[in-house]
Amino acid sequence: MRDLLIDYERFVATGKPFGRAVVTSVWGSAPRPEGSSMLATSDGRIAGSVSGGCVESATALEIEAAIQRKTPKLVTFGVSDERAWEVGLACGGTIKVFVEPAVKPQLLEAAQGKTGQVMVSVIAGTGLGEAVRVLETGEIEGQFSVALPLDAISEAAGAALRREASTSRDVETSTGSVTLFFEVFPRHPRLVIFGAGQIAAALVPLAKALGYHTIVADGRKVFLDAERFPTAGELILAWPEEAFERIGLDSACYICLLSHDPKFDEPALKVALRSPAAYVGAIGSKKTQVSRRERLRELGLSDEEIGRLHGPIGLNLGGRQPAET
């Protein structure tokens, strides 16, 4: 759903009602995993994908029907081997898609949120369409009309969040079986770049295309020009310590130091290598990396902390241009 937020705003602006479909189960080979979403308006416009080929057309019709009746529905699409290639299922199979007449506000908040969250929805059984939101702390926001094991739901949501994989499961209640769909929204990955040079300008659009929220920081105003970084999520004019403090480094941060200047890189590394960031890398040759590590030891960093540093970074393609690096 996160990749459809711009389309969501576009559809809202039309004033036309629109609904959503999300893949809840896949059997066989499929190009779109559980959690893949699609939006469709009442007049047939679509955004996103749940599979390919005729499944999209059929799903759009199901969304239109859900809008008309104002109720959700779990739909099963079975694909024969003969039609498999047409819809992108290399070996045939079955797809289950949950169709809703509108996008829930909680779902939108989860998709927009920076912290990890899981939407848990009833896709079959009593309470069809009801949902709660489970935060990465395990706290549950919202409630179901039927008594469900909330502790077990919180635990299952946490496990799905750690795997970063949406999934469905059946839960037995006093009134019968209920099928829940755990739609995972991991922490939004952030690429933090310090050093707004040519390589940074080439890296930002690539990272954005891969789904990263990009942040470019530099203490030199002349380099931090918005025209050079039209696709950057944020530009921060600050030196490393201040920039990282403002960003709030966490386990969803991937840090690339591209300044090529020890007086900027080393203070930044001292903070970054002691942070919970998932990745810390610095540009520079193998020779530069050796001397850099020695200076980091002199600054008091431990071998374990220094061992987190990736370098040289970039691809050794034999190229010289920023985009090639």
Regions flagged by a language model, labelled:
Residues 26, 260-263, 285-288:
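Short glycine-rich anion-binding loops that position phosphate/pyrophosphate groups of nucleotides
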Residues 263-277:
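Rossmann-fold NAD(P) dinucleotide-binding segment
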Residues 97, 277-278, 282-325:
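Adenosine-phosphate binding glycine-rich loop
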Residues 221-226, 264-265:
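Short, glycine/polar-rich helix-capping loops at beta-to-alpha or helix-loop-helix junctions
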Residues 233-239:
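Conserved SAM-binding strand-loop segment of SAM-dependent methyltransferases
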Residues 1-219, 227, 236, 245, ...:
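Segments forming oxygen-rich coordination pockets for charged ligands
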Residues 241-246, 316:
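Short loop/turn elements that flank and shape the SAM/SAH-binding pocket of Class I
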